[in-house]
């Protein structure tokens, strides 16, 4: 019998297009959305709002356990709602990023956020975006996707994004950054970046987003049909 609250996981390296794919899938399927990459920034922002020390595990664990956050897919955009307030813009501030780095280094906080992420699983279903969703957070997920693309293609996409914002960046610098991050993610001791054994690996190097969504939906529908 199909699950009443199926989980779809999408993992992969930085710049592969996970965020866009997950937003579109959640929108098309009418499922909840979890952006695990933003969860530490959300917790850091909640700590700042409540005057909680971002280096105190004792203070942060209860905040993480009861974190009141929603990720709302609106086409290719995602709104982050913290305690009823749209904080999408605040999440990108440098202060939030610095605080998130401190928060992410605390083991008990990471464990509390792991449990909080699992609590996102609810009817009618969940699309979870991250790096270890299918291998650690939702091991029993009904459908797992690992979205990949060559480092060169990811650097090219990033270059276009930054140039559209009027920034002067070099392709070789972006490529080096991506390759270094890939190396760190794939060789870290805890939850290294890798496809789950039962995941569909999609290489988006030579596909546009419409083709990626089509392949992903076909796979998800076949898995959910049992």
Curated annotation (Swiss-Prot):
A Gene Ontology biological process term: pyrimidine nucleotide metabolic process
Predominant location category: cytoplasm
UniProt keywords, alphabetically: ATP-binding, Cytoplasm, Kinase, Nucleotide-binding, Transferase
Catalytic activity: CMP + ATP = CDP + ADP; dCMP + ATP = dCDP + ADP
EC number(s) reported in the record: 2.7.4.25
Glycosyltransferase in keyword set: no
Membrane-spanning intervals of the chain: none
GO molecular function, one term: dCMP kinase activity
Sequence positions that bind ATP: 12-20
GO CC field: cytoplasm
Localisation per UniProt entry: Cytoplasm
CDD domains xref list: CMPK
Family from the record: Belongs to the cytidylate kinase family. Type 1 subfamily.
Name of the protein in question: Cytidylate kinase
């Amino acid at each position: 019998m199909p699950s009443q609250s199926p989980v779809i996981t999408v993992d992969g390296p930085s710049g592969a297009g996970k965020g866009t794919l997950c937003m579109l899938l959640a929108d098309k399927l009418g499922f909840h959305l979890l952006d695990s990459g933003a969860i530490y920034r959300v917790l850091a922002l909640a700590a700042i709002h409540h005057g909680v020390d971002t280096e105190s595990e004792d203070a942060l664990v209860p905040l993480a356990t009861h974190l009141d956050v929603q990720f709302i897919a609106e086409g290719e955009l995602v709104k982050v709602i913290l305690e009823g307030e749209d904080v999408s813009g605040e999440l990108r501030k440098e202060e939030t990023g610095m605080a998130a780095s401190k928060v992410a280094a605390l083991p008990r906080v990471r464990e509390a956020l792991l449990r909080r992420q699992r609590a996102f699983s609810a009817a009618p279903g969940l699309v979870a975006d991250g790096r270890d969703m299918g291998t650690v957070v939702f091991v029993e997920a009904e459908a797992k996707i690992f979205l990949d693309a060559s480092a060169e293609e990811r650097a090219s996409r990033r270059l276009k994004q930054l140039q559209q914002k009027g920034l002067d960046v070099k392709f070789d610098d972006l490529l080096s950054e991506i390759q270094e991050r890939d190396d760190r993610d794939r060789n870290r001791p805890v939850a290294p970046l890798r496809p789950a054994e039962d995941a569909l690996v999609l290489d988006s190097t030579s596909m546009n987003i419409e083709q990626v969504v089509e392949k992903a939906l076909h796979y998800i529908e076949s898995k959910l049909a049992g």
